[in-house]
């Protein structure tokens, strides 16, 4: 008798366009996912639709990854997709230091925190990490100073 271990892919930003599309594709291909989003109604609705587990948390909050770890428990994780992000368009002359710090915290600090939190689980299960970036890499936008 073969014993199969069910592993999950964790998707942060699961209720956005990229995150929800990725979750649906993974489910269609037979994978299981753990969805992470900041809006309880949206993430629980998507989790119900996909028959998936989920965590509600905001990546800008201190120790947000502890909630994800708690909800996952001993679940083996073999993939992490960071689909969180925003696009804040304004001319450079109107930007403030706080705009850059907010973007830095959202796009870099929160990604490194969740990677560190899941690193042992991912390593043990030969997992991988995907960090989604912005469309602005391919095509610039006016007033994309942040």
What are the roles of these predicted feature ranges?
Residues 91-92, 99-104:
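Substrate-binding pocket helix/loop in short-chain dehydrogenase/reductase
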Residues 115-116:
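A short, exposed helix-loop element centered on a Lys and neighboring polar residues
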Residues 49-63:
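Rossmann-fold cofactor-recognition segment
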Residues 81-89:
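Conserved NAD(P)H cofactor-binding loop of Rossmann-fold oxidoreductase domains
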Residues 128-146:
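Catalytic loop of short-chain dehydrogenase/reductase
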Residues 15, 20-23:
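N-terminal Rossmann NAD(P)H-binding glycine-rich loop of SDR-like oxidoreductase domains
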Residues 31-43:
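Conserved glycine-rich Rossmann-like NAD(P)H-binding loop of the short-chain dehydrogenase/reductase
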């Amino acid at each position: 008798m073969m014993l199969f271990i069910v592993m999950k892919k964790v998707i942060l930003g699961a209720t956005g366009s990229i995150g929800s599309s990725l979750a649906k594709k993974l489910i269609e291909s037979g994978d299981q996912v753990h969805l992470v989003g900041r809006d309880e109604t949206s993430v629980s609705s998507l989790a119900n639709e996909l028959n998936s587990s989920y965590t509600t948390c905001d990546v800008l909050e201190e120790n947000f990854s502890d909630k994800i770890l708690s909800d996952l428990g001993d679940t083996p994780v073999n993939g992490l997709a960071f689909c969180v992000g925003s696009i804040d368009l304004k001319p450079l002359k109107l930007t403030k230091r706080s705009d850059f710090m907010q973007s830095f915290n959202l796009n870099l600090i929160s990604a490194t925190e969740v990677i560190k939190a899941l690193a042992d689980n991912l390593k043990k299960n030969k997992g991988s990490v995907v960090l989604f970036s912005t469309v602005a890499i391919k095509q610039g936008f006016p007033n994309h100073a942040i």
